[in-house]
Amino acid sequence: MESQDYIPALPPSSVDAERSVLGAVLQDSGAATLAFETLSPEDFYTAEHREIFSAMQTLHIAGNPIDLMTVGNELSRRGTLDSVGGPAYLLEAVRFVPTTEIGRAHV
């Protein structure tokens, strides 16, 4: 019997959609509320996005604001800021979303 080549299915994901969600959460408390009600860190395909969302979720649960500074500080406290792309990547996520409605659409 001949063996067939097996190609595993890739999980559905869009790095751009994930970045849109992160950018929207950083800019809009309404988008943040929707994201935290709907998503968990495990819903993100990239490890970097999982870690960023997890840091955001930690801040949210503690009742802290979510913005570039607080998320950057939380990631720094965890020792993961550099591994997720640093402050520059967080800023890129914000700039990637021209309106938070786009990020909300991807939740």
Indicate where each model-derived feature is located.
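Noncatalytic partner-interaction/assembly domains of nucleic-acid and motor enzyme complexes
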Residues: 1-104
